[in-house]
């Protein structure tokens, strides 16, 4: 009994340590990309975020496999789908946890490049084989916080869902706010939400942060509607699972090639509605660090030889949500990005 209790205690401490270690990954990416805020080069901002995150993984005691990242092996030099990350692989340590990794080193590349709010760096971690291997295509989504969990249905109209969400939260539709990506494809959706009487916050990029905001009462966001990236849908589902929220998603293919690729990956077709637990199964962890100041997190602030970051770390097993404000001293911190001109 004592031995079993000790093993359970050890596993629990490893899980807790891992939950706190993941934020170091997003901090590294945020610190690197924030140097390029407002400088108009979204590709370079994304590149340095990817580079910094990849290097930071080398110090993490895991055997991780990227299942959602920067694309296929021939499309991305780092953090490609199937890449092994973590110190555990190099050491051959069988006791290092084997996990799935879902990352977006810089969600909102355009936001960072223009200095707009809500660019973030995000990561989600689950046990091996627990994330949906979402293809790089679109996903129609609806996301809500805990109060409106189990009352939404992606098959129904936005108006129908708004009525149910408002009732669940004890408010009128006119008091509800929906966050929607500002895209031409959403013109009818935006018109319907306006006709229903709800308020709208249009965002240029970043529906992961939009989905997470539905679970934060201080954000004023009640629901996310619309179609965005399928990989981002899995990451957002992991985040909402940690706090008791809900995301439903349905794949939307843009071409026959995308449809065929999904079949090869073993993913179900466009008629399937994926629940939160189908997108992110088991115990999951989520972390995000702000790059630019936003509604979800504060951005990176530089002070010559140091910088401050704000991050959020969540874990589904315990429901714990931690907000971490950190000060980073560049004269002692590892250098995660070697991109020209980014030295502090």
Where are the model-predicted features located?
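Helical "lid/coupling" subdomains associated with nucleotide-phosphate turnover
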Residues: 204, 213-218, 223-344
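DPxDG-like acidic metal-binding loop motif
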Residues: 96-107, 111-132
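Acidic beta-strand-loop-alpha-helix segment within the catalytic core
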Residues: 122-203, 265-266, 294-295, 299-301, ...
């Amino acid at each position: 009994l004592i031995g079993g209790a000790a093993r359970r205690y050890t596993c629990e401490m490893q899980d807790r340590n891992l939950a706190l270690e993941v934020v170091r990954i997003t901090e590294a990416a945020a610190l690197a990309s924030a140097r390029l805020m407002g400088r108009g080069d979204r590709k370079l901002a994304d590149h340095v975020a990817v580079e910094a995150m990849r290097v930071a993984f080398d110090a993490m005691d895991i055997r991780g496999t990227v299942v959602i990242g920067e694309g296929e092996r021939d499309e991305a030099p780092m953090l490609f789908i199937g890449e092994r990350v973590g110190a555990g692989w190099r050491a051959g340590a069988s006791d290092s946890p084997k996990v799935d990794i879902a990352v977006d080193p810089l969600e909102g590349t355009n936001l960072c490049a223009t200095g707009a709010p809500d660019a973030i760096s995000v990561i989600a971690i689950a046990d091996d084989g627990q994330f949906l291997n979402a293809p790089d295509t679109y996903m129609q989504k609806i996301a809500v916080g805990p109060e409106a969990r189990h009352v939404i249905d992606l098959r129904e109209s936005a108006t129908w869902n708004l009525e149910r969400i408002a009732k669940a939260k004890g408010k009128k539709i006119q008091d509800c706010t929906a966050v929607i990506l500002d895209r031409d494809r959403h013109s009818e959706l935006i018109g319907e939400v306006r006709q229903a009487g709800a308020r709208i916050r249009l965002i240029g990029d970043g529906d992961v942060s939009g989905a997470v905001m539905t679970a934060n009462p201080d954000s004023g966001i009640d629901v996310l509607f619309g179609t965005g990236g399928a990989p981002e849908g899995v990451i957002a589902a992991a985040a909402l699972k940690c706090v008791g929220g809900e995301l439903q998603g349905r794949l939307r293919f843009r071409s026959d090639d995308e449809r065929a690729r999904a079949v090869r990956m073993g993913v179900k077709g466009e008629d399937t509605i994926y629940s939160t637990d189908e997108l992110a199964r088991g115990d999951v962890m989520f972390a995000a660090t702000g790059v630019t100041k936003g509604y979800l997190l504060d951005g990176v602030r530089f002070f010559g030889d140091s910088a401050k970051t704000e991050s959020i770390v969540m874990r589904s097993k315990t429901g714990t949500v931690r907000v971490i404000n950190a000060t980073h001293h560049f004269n002692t911190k590892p250098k995660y990005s070697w991109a020209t001109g980014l030295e502090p």
